Amino acid sequence: MDKKMFCFQCEQTVGCTGCTGNAGACGKKADTARLQDELTGALISLARAVDGSTAISKRTGQIIIEGLFTTVTNVNFDDVSIENMIQKVRAEKERLVPDCSKCQSPCGKTDEYDMQQLWDANEDIRSLKSLILFGIRGMAAYAYHANVLNYEDAEVNRFFCEALFMIGYGESVETLLPTVLKVGEINLKCMALLDKANTETYGIPEPTDVTLTIEKGPFIVVTGHDLRDLQLLLEQTEGKGINIYTHGEMLPAHAYPFLKKFSHLKGNFGTAWQNQQKEFDHLPAPILYTTNCLMPPKSSYADRVFTTEMVAFPGAVHIDEKKDFTPVIEKALELGGYKEDQILTGINGGTKVTTGFGHAAILSHAGTVVEAVKSGAIRHFFLVAGCDGAKPGRNYYTEFVKQTPSDSIVLTLACGKFRFNDLELGEIGGLPRLMDMGQCNDAYGAIQVAVALADAFGCSVNELPLSFVLSWYEQKAVCILLTLLHLGIKNIRLGPSLPAFLSPNILNFLVENYGIAPITTPEEDIKALLNHSK
């Protein structure tokens, strides 16, 4: 069969083998996929041009981060935008090694890496390189969000080059495997950097109830992950009679004190990303996409889709780095919003959700938690976290949370929580049984809680009554998984399906060394996880 493209970086890839037709499962066209490969090849060549430098300039680092972020699933569907990014990468390489373009001798500095070499490689080499590539793509998103708040880490920037070089020129399992785990190590630093950036800029998240009711009148829906974009929009809409509602991974913004002070930040609209084409259908308001996940818009709302930062879609109005949101504001006033209040619900019928249980909030009750564990009031902790998606089988996570014992605590983060975050699970000792820790990058906070509990009980994280039940969809989930592996976390349950880019040998390595297992049924997995912790 003639392959029009090849991509297997997301959980929904066709047949759990790879998208090869005229378009991917995510909606990107084959031409777009080929441009993403060309961009990745250019980035590998730029990393080669850096040639082991210990001091990556801020400019070079930012270009690499932007290029990697552009290739994350559901970020950029616009070929012109990607072509411009490719030229930006090539221009930076020319700036670093200007004589290379004049040289007639082929070498790694003059030739761009052809991604077909990776896709055609030995399956174990391809698997390890894919883990590195998809991991640093996810990590680039976190680095980007930190950078826009003027936080950066030279070690993180330097590692992007190191990892890209290994993708292009690493030749053995023995050399690639340490880099896979180092992605997890550096991603931990990157998530810590973003946690610092967010909390020092917007304050420590506080437990906060968020309504799902949409008030009548003009409003704007903000989706994605970028808190700075939300801040700027709130500032530009203040006093204009326009309400702002979060969507998807922007929900945790309600917990930050700086953002909470805006009275027109009203609540949350809708559920997770994969439901947007239904939920945004004929929406009487504009939608601002700050990051993934963007799905190709339906005609019923395409005229009210606005993108910014690295997000782009053909025909959508893009808000550039000047951050003048006037077109979005004018569209909100033109559409006018709903004529009456709309009482919406979560997937399970709840009319509100709660967020803001970051690591600081939970650890402020550390004494209560430790005593509850010692007394037997809390028997187990479940971290049920990760991405949501459209693939059948994800209702597993709803049923899993529903069936967790009444003497257990459920921690959650990322958009997978929309499967169950409107459930009322009650309390233990004044603490809610279900605690939303934030966005996917707030996995850093979950790690801090786990480490603090292990210290309190004088044991390792693996010896805690704590189980990781994860869902994945895109590349940020990959870098988080690699961070957990770097920390030695074992017996993770992963679903709804295992990554197509894991070869049998590499998967077997993860099973034998880390006990990774696919999800089965909620009943069987809960029983097995509780028995394992005894």
Question: Where do the protein language model's features map onto the residues?
Answer:
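Electropositive, gly/pro-rich neighborhoods at or near active sites that engage anionic ligands
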Residues: 43-201
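Anaerobic metallocofactor- and corrinoid-dependent redox/one-carbon enzyme cores
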Residues: 2-32, 36-37, 41-45, 54, ...
